[in-house]
Structure formats: C-alpha cells, structure tokens
Amino acid sequence: MNDMLFRTLLKRYEATIEDSLYKIQSFNENNIIIPEHIDITGEIDKLLLIIAESEDKVAVMRKYYGKKEAKNTEYKIL
C-alpha cells in the first residue's frame, strides 16, 4: 500500500470516528430527539458500531502496512 493511499484511508477512518463521537456528544449534551430517530439508544449503538469498525480498520492497516510505510518515504506523489 503506498503512502498516500495509507494516509487517505487513515484520515477517512479518523474522520468517521470523530463524526460519530460528535453525534454521541450532541445527543448527550443537548438531549436532542429527532422525530425520525426516536430510539436514542439504538442510534447511539449504531454510532458505537461505526466507531468500533473504524478503529478496527485503523488497527489492521497499522498492523499490516504501518511498518512498511515508515520505511518507504523516499518518493513523492505529485
């Protein structure tokens, strides 16, 4: 996996995690109830699943491609 692809995927998963955490925080702090989403615990459960899946993907990328990327930083993509 090349460096740019690795960084792009990493940013995607990190953004997904941040987005989900923000939504959970908003539910918690503002007591927001959206008419289409009355099942708050169900919605938070879905967001937690999204976080867990994204964290798993980041862990797998770092396990299998992280060390390779640290060694291969000689080239630049224009």
Which residues fall in each region the model found?
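Extended, charge-rich alpha-helical interface modules
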Residues: 1-78
